[in-house]
């Protein structure tokens, strides 16, 4: 594991957060594996395509995501993981706008020459 491997993994996480706010479908589709799942704080396990669709249609509207901390970055072979903590301003599934201290446990895998997010679990911190 090199420092540049760790930096590349962190940059994917940061790109995802930017893409959520910017509603950048192309970036999300590029960095999220087709089989990616997002486990929400409610326990709901959401498939990649449904999550992207809800970002695009505004059911999940992200206004901002301010990074506070990224830690436990591990790269081993073709797998990687990290924990990110961001203050996320969003309105979700018809609720009002709130700011959450959102922690994401992110797992990534190198496939076909590129590293993609394969699973994520959300909680608060």
Language-model segments: what does each one mean?
Residues 81, 100-125:
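Short beta-strand edge/turn micro-motifs at domain boundaries
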Residues 10, 17-18:
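Amphipathic alpha-helical repeat scaffolds
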Residues 72-74, 89, 107-109:
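Generic structural detector for well-ordered beta-strands
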Residues 3-7, 25-75, 85, 98-99:
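A solvent-exposed, acidic/Ser-Thr-rich amphipathic alpha-helical stretch
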Residues 84-91:
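Generic short beta-strand segments
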Residues 16, 23-24:
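Short helix-adjacent coil turns
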Residues 93-95:
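Outer-membrane beta-barrel domain signature
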């Amino acid at each position: 594991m090199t420092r540049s491997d760790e930096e590349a993994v962190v940059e994917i996480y940061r790109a995802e957060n930017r893409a959520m706010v910017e509603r950048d479908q192309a970036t999300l589709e590029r960095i999220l594996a087709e089989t990616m799942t997002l486990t929400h704080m409610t326990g709901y396990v959401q498939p990649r395509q449904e999550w992207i669709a809800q970002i695009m249609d505004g059911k999940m509207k992200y206004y901002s995501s301010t990074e506070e901390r990224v830690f436990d970055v591990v790269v081993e072979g073709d797998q990687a993981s990290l924990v990110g903590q961001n203050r996320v301003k969003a309105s979700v599934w018809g609720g009002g706008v709130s700011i959450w201290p959102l922690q994401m446990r992110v797992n990534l895998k190198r496939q076909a020459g590129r590293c993609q997010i394969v699973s994520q679990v959300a909680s608060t911190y």
